[in-house]
Amino acid sequence: MTTFYTVVSWLVILGYWLLIAGVTLRILMKRRAVPSAMAWLLIIYILPLVGIIAYLSFGELHLGKRRAERARAMWPSTAKWLNDLKSCKHIFAEENSSVASSLFKLCERRQGIAGVKGNQLQLLTDSDDVMQALIRDIQLARHNIEMVFYIWQPGGMADKVAESLMAAARRGIHCRLMLDSAGSVAFFRSPWAAMMRNAGIEVVEALKVNLMRVFLRRMDLRQHRKMIMIDNYIAYTGSMNMVDPRFFKQDAGVGQWVDVMARMEGPIATAMGVIYSCDWEIETGKRILPPPPDVNIMPFEQASGHTIHTIASGPGFPEDLIHQALLTATYSAREYLIMTTPYFVPSDDLLHAICTAAQRGVDVSIILPRKNDSMLVGWASRAFFTELLAAGVKIYQFEGGLLHTKSVLVDGELSLVGTVNLDMRSLWLNFEITLAIDDKGFGADLAAVQDDYISRSRLLDERLWLKRPLWQRVAERLFYFFSPLL
């Protein structure tokens, strides 16, 4: 009996070390950033069981077998659709400004579609204005409405939108709603999900959280897009979830959330529609590719129309494209660069690009919320401040609430607006969307919004920053070490 237990003990020990060795080899063989690999190895060797479970759950990008198969199956038809769309030459921009040219070429070559022109665009900064405009558009819809959000939180104006969407479905409008399972957990636990389905709306719970499948798919891979398409002609996107900020997370101690949304009319709705159709097919297996733009209603010839490129990310989409787009935009800056983000945990490459821009004479500003709803990200962000300040970057800490806007403005002409935070999760993991807009008029609108944020912010003083307590420096470095995993 003693021999039996001895053999079992040795087998357990051998299996334990083989498991550690196997995971270590897996980490080393995967092409990833060195800081990320080192952080994972440290966790695994300090807390082996916890580290192994964490790595198997969150260390690699697993979409899940069924969704991965759907993603592979959809691309031939999607690629053909994009190729056929090229015959509509009148919707594509033939040239761009000097500051936007490199970025638009990158996106065209990697996504297979050029930027589209002839769009009318409005930047909305007040949540009530967004909701009221959306309700009007829903009431006037004639054919179809598609929506996707990370968070839909019942209450306030969000309920008014839900009621108008149900009314549209009852009068025969084809309505589809996709919501992230984790972000919209309150919605799916409320009566609204059943009420919408009973009204005829197709409601899909995207990327369902299932602990039984934790090792088969990354549970922290989320559907983070915020998009609305109406009649293949009107589109919305931006940083705002379907929430009323007067009711949303009021116990978090960070104030009301501050967002922007872009409302668009024109062929950009078709470009966004194909992204939505890909998400829908990955989640449901149903193909809903949008029709080509209607030449009878698209304002193609309007000289005032904006040129816009959609940049999508997530499993199945061009890898690393949003990160490349941010790098390209940063290196394209010649006069000034303004970035707004709630969560700032940049890659080494992006941090280097931002610092280099400041060091070559570009006026670089970053606007962040002073109070953050994520303690981990808040502390990790602070670890980058010293290097940024030393390079000459101005850091503004917004004091008017939780600044949730995600925007970049380059030389007053190239604007990036969408759902992408400047952190690892948005850059490489989640389903995200960003609009690249080549237009001085829209750039002026975005600059006015950013100036308003700056007027409600406190400029970080480098001298005072360097005098902060030692315990804060230690906490910052601790969270910085784990920043590749955030």
Swiss-Prot record:
Q: Which GO terms describe its molecular function?
A: cardiolipin synthase activity
List, alphabetically, the Gene3D superfamilies matched: Endonuclease Chain A
- Note the coiled coil stretches, chain numbering: none
Which interval of the chain is the signal sequence?
A: none
The reply on keyword Ribosomal protein is no
Reaction(s) catalyzed by this protein? Answer: 2 a 1,2-diacyl-sn-glycero-3-phospho-(1'-sn-glycerol) = a cardiolipin + glycerol
SMART domains reported for this sequence: PLDc (SM00155)
Q: Which Pfam families match?
A: PLDc_2, PLDc_N
Q: Where does the PLD phosphodiesterase domain start and stop, copy by copy?
A: 219-246, 399-426
Membrane-crossing segments per the record: 3-23, 38-58
Q: Which domain of life is it from?
A: Bacteria
Q: Which InterPro entries does the entry mention?
A: Cardiolipin_synthase (IPR022924), CL_synthase_A (IPR030840), CLS_N (IPR027379), PLD-like_dom (IPR025202), PLipase_D/transphosphatidylase (IPR001736)
Q: In which compartments does the protein localize?
A: Cell inner membrane
The GO biological-process annotations, alphabetized, read as:
cardiolipin biosynthetic process
Q: Any idea which UniProt keywords this protein has?
A: Cell inner membrane, Cell membrane, Lipid biosynthesis, Lipid metabolism, Membrane, Phospholipid biosynthesis, Phospholipid metabolism, Repeat, Transferase, Transmembrane, Transmembrane helix
Q: Which GO terms describe its cellular component?
A: plasma membrane
* Keyword Thylakoid applies: no
Q: What membrane topology is given?
A: Multi-pass membrane protein
Q: What is its EC number?
A: 2.7.8.-
Q: According to its UniProt record, which protein family does this protein belong to?
A: Belongs to the phospholipase D family. Cardiolipin synthase subfamily. ClsA sub-subfamily.
State the HAMAP family in the record: Cardiolipin_synth_ClsA
**NCBIfam families with a match to the protein in the record:** bac_cardiolipin
Tell me the function of this protein. Answer: Catalyzes the reversible phosphatidyl group transfer from one phosphatidylglycerol molecule to another to form cardiolipin (CL) (diphosphatidylglycerol) and glycerol.
Q: What is this protein called?
A: Cardiolipin synthase A
Specify the species: Escherichia fergusonii (strain ATCC 35469 / DSM 13698 / CCUG 18766 / IAM 14443 / JCM 21226 / LMG 7866 / NBRC 102419 / NCTC 12128 / CDC 0568-73)
